[in-house]
Structures are given as structure tokens and as C-alpha cells.
Amino acid sequence: MNAPKILILKFSALGDVVHTLPIAATIRKSLPDSYIAWMVEERYQDILAGNPDIDEVIPLRTKVWRKNWNSKSLGEILNTIKTLRRQNFDLVLDLHGLLKSGVIAGLSGASTRVGFHRKNCKEKINTLFTNRKAPHMTKGLHVVDMTLTLLQTALGKVEEAKLFPL
């Protein structure tokens, strides 16, 4: 894979986003010329802003959309989808295993959408939207190890970055 455009889907929560930061550093170490975008809930975007391993932070406003559902919300959702599709991502890494992350992965237009094994998804329906699955992982495996396994499903063997910026 030559300088791929990669979209990471990990929207929330604060601790989960922090725990998955090593994936961006590992991608950057393995594919230094890749373009890495990360979609995250708007209220957590500052955690990722300025991270040298992430080229773009795409804020998501699902909490706002749910609270104030109206035609403006629908317009914002459609614009978000259009923006994603225009990016022409090669690879999406769905680190959630939820319906909403699966739908976004599917609507992204990326040819390769990697997610968790059905048994590791929080919402099984997610697997309908990914076309490559990480192998089943035993319960209790740390989230950092789970995301690394998912990344290896996408890219093959990668050398894990032990240090990553916060």
C-alpha cells in the first residue's frame, strides 16, 4: 500500500480515545507518508489537535444532532458524509464496533473497511458495513492490543510505536 489515505473512527469517550492514540503513531511509523484522519466527537477533538501523527481531525456532532434533531442537523449530517466521500479514503479503521461507526465506514466510500470480529463488536450489525474483520479476540484483551490486532488485519505486520504524543 503506497501512501494510503486512512480514516480512523473512534468518536468517544475520553479514555477510549486516549487508549487508541497508539494506533496513529503505529501507522505513522509503518507508513510515514500516509495521510491519517481521525473522526471524533466534537468535544474530544482538542485531544487529537496538534498530534504530529494525525493529519486531520474531523469533528462529529452526534450528541448535538440527537439532542436538537431538525433540518439543520440533517443538513450537517449530509455535509459530513459528502466531506468524507470527497476525501477518497483508501482505508477505514472502525475501532468502535457500533452501528453508527459502521454506517459511517460504509458511507465513507473507502474500498477497504476494517472492523472487529462479530463476537468483539458491541453492536453485531456493525459487521455488515466492514469488509475485512480482525480475528476473534479473547475477552479481557486490552484495548491497545485489540486495536493493534485490527491494524495488523489491515496492513499486515506492523511495528508498534511504544511512545506516542499526547
Describe these PLM feature segments:
Residues 1-166:
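Catalytic machinery of carbohydrate-active enzymes
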